[in-house]
Amino acid sequence: MFQDNPLLAQLKQQLHAQTPRVEGLVKGTDKGFGFLEVDGQKSYFIPPPQMKKVMHGDRIIAAVHTNNDKESAEPEELVEPFLTRFVGRVQKKEGDNRLWIIPDHPLLKDAIPCRPIKSLTHPFADQDWAVAEMRRHPLKGDKHFQAELTDFITDKDDHFAPWWVTLMRHQLERNAPEVDSETLTLHDDLPREDLTALSFVTIDSASTEDMDDALYIRKEENGQLSLYIAIADPTAYIQPNSELDTIAAQRALTNYLPGFNIPMLPRELSDNLCSLRPNEKRPALVCQVGIMEDGALTDEIHFYSAWVESKAKLVYDNISDWLEGEETQWAPENEIVHEQVMLLKEMSEKRHVWREQHALVFKERPDYRFILDDSGNVLDIVAEKRRTANRIVEEAMITANICAAKVLSRNLGFGIYNVHTGFDPLYIDQVSQTLKEHGIETNADELLTLEGFCRLRRELDNQPNQFLDSRIRRFQNFAEIKTEPGPHFGLGLEAYATWTSPIRKYSDILNHRLLKAIISKSAAEKPQDEDCVRIAERRRANRMAERDVGDWLYARFLKPFAGTESTFNAEIIDITRGGIRVRLVENGAIAFIPAPFLHAVRDEIQCSQETGSVIIKGETAYKLNDIIPVRIEDVKLETRNIVARPI
């Protein structure tokens, strides 16, 4: 009776047209249901049957239905899938040739049917790691999700899976680039000054092979210091647009992961031909600058294409122990090295004081280093504080990069610059209001200037804690890479252009070529904005890879502590609606403390990212940068999540 009824069809069409629709992101839960978040303001419940049509992270359009004053979302159209290419673990049942894959993501737990592409002949076993690409989606008219396996990564028993899986996830190279060593010859027709008689020294870790900077310093009759910064010159071997140049441009950076690195350049170049090894003549680009009594740089800055010869390979810890009066077997091997170390220390102290007064100095935080055995097991995690020798090299490199920025700006007006513009103007009123609430009166317009930003930073550095600094840090812009000079608010400098790590950074290779063009008075080609985009994307991928491997290793290391009485001091680094994130001071691991662990009565606790505090019964119980004792409650190896509980 009702079949093909035009009135009924019209009614359905009207009801469909009248049903409100929203676009948003699907947020999954581990309980089968989900939510559709719209513009971060409103969320709609997605019942379990409807969640089978979508995946956490999908951007969709959904119909909103109201039943007994309760709203729910019915997914209708896929705008952008969350999963396209992904890594995961294969599932295969014994005696069954069918394959499934579970994506390696904390909120994606459903197995997706899959099959290998024709060219992939690896016989997959249960729990193998693989790369897959989504091929079917229910909102695209398919009956179910389906994926295609495109790469085998490694098997379930490989203890180095954290590295291989992470590199494949971020589509990063696994090995050093390989080129015919016979092609690694000098292509350098630029006249070089012979500076091999100067007593350059390198300062690195004991295990460092790719030594790309050497320092020489002397005191002039007028009391000023003359600092020479020699930087390895791979551009003497790498012609623009050559095969090797293309490789370096693609990789953009050496990738430093816990336990090992994947170099940007062939190791024959980075660890041998270009490495500033002691007593070996090497091509270098050298910057010479004077440092006055108050630590200011002189206006006279000279760049040379030169030959240098390091006279000694010095080690950070040895120099620091000796200069800091620690018990050590090491001492300068001769008077020349002794003089260099003492003058470099003087330079470092003067430059540090000058930067504190006229620019900005970063708050020092320790670096955390994983100690691994040959099988990739974490034996220990050590905190390495920045010591005297580290500060010597840091001040010399910052000085060199300031000089490069000045020379490039004066002579060309372009280069590769690190630019940081401070606070986002959209949030500057919130910054001013937050500061006012804590007794600091400011002018919003002044905070957007380099001088005003520096003045505020120095005032914040004098605060008894970093709470206020952490509150307003989220209103800052991210640092960028630009082809034209601009200020670096974070360093408190008018311009900053790095060139001191050309073995490890392609941006520094580009600046080397521009500096050489200035030296030779030849034409210089302005870098493309696309170069900056590619370098920034690769830097982000490398940092994410380092974080992901670190999370995996932290989870392995802390798993034995879960549920024990072992106590760790932890710094509160973020506060969200669901709880707080902390960093373990001893080893740098990030853990999450759910709000119910802070206070059991839900209506009596408020976790506020806006105020950077946790309010319990109307009183501030925790705030950003507090140090609190915690125990490890649970470690989920599958998701690399560490859950802690305050004591």
Curated annotation (Swiss-Prot):
Parts of the chain that traverse the membrane: none
A Pfam family this chain is assigned to: OB_RNB
Highest taxon, organism lineage: Bacteria
S-S bridge residues: none
Location within or outside the cell: Cytoplasm
Residues of the RNB domain: 192-520
MF GO annotations: exoribonuclease II activity; RNA binding
GO biological process: mRNA catabolic process
InterPro entries, alphabetized: CSD (IPR011129), NA-bd_OB-fold (IPR012340), RNase_B_OB_dom (IPR013223), RNase_II (IPR011804), RNase_II/R (IPR001900), RNase_II/R_CS (IPR022966), RNase_II/RNase_R (IPR004476), RNR_Ribonuclease (IPR050180)
Gene Ontology CC terms: cytosol
EC number: 3.1.13.1
Keyword set includes Hydrolase: yes
Protein family (similarity comment): Belongs to the RNR ribonuclease family. RNase II subfamily.
PANTHER family: EXORIBONUCLEASE 2 (PTHR23355:SF37), RIBONUCLEASE (PTHR23355)
Name used for this protein in its record: Exoribonuclease 2
